[in-house]
């Protein structure tokens, strides 16, 4: 897909009744109702196939403000759904080193557990840093 191709139309806005219309390659204009959590305005740089239409919630980032580097984002999460694909369930999208992963409830709970475990480890390491900087345990 070429980045210099124009957007098909200005990002369609949601109508008062919660619907929006998307021009697709294979099904013409598709009129759909967006879930209340859908943040995407459904503007595409090229017409998508109907199965590529995506609902996404507003992304939420874990943010940290460090004295050394200032504010930084750590992980992005948000709801995602392809209402016309064979995977029409709602997923949690998580930005990782492996890319943007879509997981169900079990995967989401496991990621949350891993992040809590990592947060505990970071707290332990921060305590160790305090001791090292104070000259203890060197």
Where are these regions (language model features)?
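Positively charged, low-complexity terminal tracts
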Residues: 1-138
